[in-house]
Amino acid sequence: MSSGGLLLLLALLTLWAELTPISGHDRPTFCNLAPESGRCRGHLRRIYYNPDSNKCEVFFYGGCGGNDNNFETRKKCRQTCGAPRKGRPT
């Protein structure tokens, strides 16, 4: 296969991965964890996946500790945990 063909295949696989919804069975287990502010006293606006509402929601992170259900953007939360897009910017 030519290098152009490989690049096309890679582009198609990347697009497919972005557009394929994540089911609850494919979702990382940390997506089901409750948000944890951690042990530090910062006040950082972060996003977590809420499995009860199937949405990425805001919480405030202290800056250290916590768990992996902690994202800087809604986009990253959606990509990782599969919440539907709400039509708002990240």
From Swiss-Prot:
It is found in: Secreted. Residues 1-24 form the signal peptide. The record marks 41-42 as: Reactive bond for trypsin. Belongs to the venom Kunitz-type family. Disulfide bonds join 31-81, 40-64, 56-77. One of its GO terms (molecular function) is serine-type endopeptidase inhibitor activity. PROSITE patterns: BPTI_KUNITZ_1, BPTI_KUNITZ_2. Pfam families: Kunitz_BPTI. Expressed by the venom gland. The keyword Signal applies. GO terms for cellular component: extracellular region. Residues 85-90 form a propeptide. This is Kunitz-type serine protease inhibitor C5. Serine protease inhibitor that inhibits trypsin. InterPro entries: Kunitz_BPTI (IPR002223), Kunitz_BPTI_sf (IPR036880), Prtase_inh_Kunz-CS (IPR020901), TFPI/VKTCI-like (IPR050098). Residues 31-81 form the BPTI/Kunitz inhibitor domain. It comes from Daboia siamensis (Eastern Russel's viper). Keywords: Cleavage on pair of basic residues, Disulfide bond, Protease inhibitor, Secreted, Serine protease inhibitor, Signal. Its main location: secreted.
